[in-house]
């Protein structure tokens, strides 16, 4: 898992990188957490701002 995929996609297990639907707040979350889906762990990323 070299590249991180954030935002929602067709499968919940697989998150694809979609910057168009990704919000600015969630986008930062994705950059910090490269092992989890930005949307699924949005709350956790918010805590570790």
UniProtKB/Swiss-Prot annotation:
Testis. One of its GO terms (cellular component) is nucleus. Coiled coil: none annotated. InterPro entries: Protamine_P1. One of its GO terms (biological process) is chromosome condensation. GO terms for molecular function: DNA binding. The keyword DNA-binding applies. It is found in: Nucleus; Chromosome. Keywords: Chromosome, Developmental protein, Differentiation, DNA condensation, DNA-binding, Nucleosome core, Nucleus, Spermatogenesis. Belongs to the protamine P1 family. Protamines substitute for histones in the chromatin of sperm during the haploid phase of spermatogenesis. They compact sperm DNA into a highly condensed, stable and inactive complex. This is Sperm protamine P1.
């Amino acid at each position: 898992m070299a590249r991180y995929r954030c935002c929602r996609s067709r499968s919940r297990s697989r998150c694809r990188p979609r910057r168009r639907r990704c919000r600015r707040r969630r986008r930062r979350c994705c950059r910090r957490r490269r092992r989890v889906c930005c949307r699924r762990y949005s709350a956790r990323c918010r805590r570790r701002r």
